[in-house]
Design a protein with these regions (language model features):
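Short, charged helix-to-loop "capping" segments that act as catalytic/coupling loops
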Residues: 79-88, 122-127
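Active-site neighborhood of phospho(di)ester-bond hydrolases with catalytic His/Asp-centered motifs
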Residues: 15-16, 52-56, 87-94, 116-119, ...
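N-terminal active-site segment of His-dependent metallophosphoesterases
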Residues: 3-77, 81-85
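Metal-dependent catalytic neighborhoods of phosphoester/phosphodiester hydrolases
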Residues: 25, 58-76, 92-111, 117, ...
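Cofactor- and metal-binding active-site motifs of prokaryotic enzymes
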Residues: 62, 82-83, 91, 129-134, ...
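His/Asp/Glu-rich metal-coordinating catalytic cores
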Residues: 96-207
């Protein structure tokens, strides 16, 4: 989080890599995931969380079962109904179908949930950086956080960079740098910048 010396009033809970629908060496983890989501819902309620972050790999496969999707949507409905100030930000991971995850966005926005799976392009082919930005409000209704909501980046999602190094790594770096530059110009004195993303390095990490 990039901020000045003021205190951020938004309580954030970060999660990643749910992998709903996963079968682990033949073992169906549905019961485990149900227990986890019940625990998470209770944590959100007890700790009065204002923003839940899900940083990639919501599902284990790009074409999740109806049961896995039902578990996901029921959780979102439950926690946003139980917690009237809760906002949710979700970015796609490499296991998720970017388009499938983002497809119900208009419905999810009615439940204060923002999903970023696809890196959209403007008419001229430039990256739509506004789409990769999510505003989070405090309980007074003031925008306090500008989120860099960046999904897992595939070839063609990031700016082309002339480099003798790793073109993927440098392209990803350039996208984050350009997005940060735009948000830095946009932010006001009382707003912080929160980076949310998904990357693969020596290990898989939701940021």
């Amino acid at each position: 989080v990039i901020r000045d010396s003021y205190k951020i009033m938004i309580r954030i809970l970060h999660t990643a890599d749910w992998h709903l629908g996963q079968t682990f060496f033949g073992y169906d983890r549905t019961e485990e995931h149900g227990v986890f989501l019940n625990w998470l819902a209770e944590e959100i309620r007890q700790k009065e969380i204002d923003a839940l972050i899900i940083a990639g790999d919501v599902f284990d496969v790009s074409n999740p079962s109806a049961a896995s999707q039902s578990m996901y949507y029921q959780f979102i409905y439950r926690v946003t109904a139980e917690n009237p100030y809760l906002q949710i930000v979700i970015v796609a991971g490499n296991h998720d179908s970017a388009a499938r995850l983002e497809a119900p966005l208009p419905l999810l926005q009615a439940m204060r949930t923002e999903v970023r799976g696809v890196v959209r392009k403007l008419e001229g082919g430039e990256i739509d950086y506004d789409h990769l930005t999510v505003e989070l409000k405090n309980r007074k209704g003031e925008v306090e956080l500008l989120c860099m909501a960046v999904p897992f980046l595939r070839q063609g999602d990031y700016p082309a960079v002339q480099t003798e190094g790793n073109p993927y790594a440098e392209g990803v770096r350039e996208l984050y740098a350009q997005l940060l530059q735009r948000l830095w110009k946009r932010r006001t004195e009382n707003q912080a910048i929160l980076a949310i993303g998904y990357r693969i390095g020596n290990c898989r990490e939701g940021l």
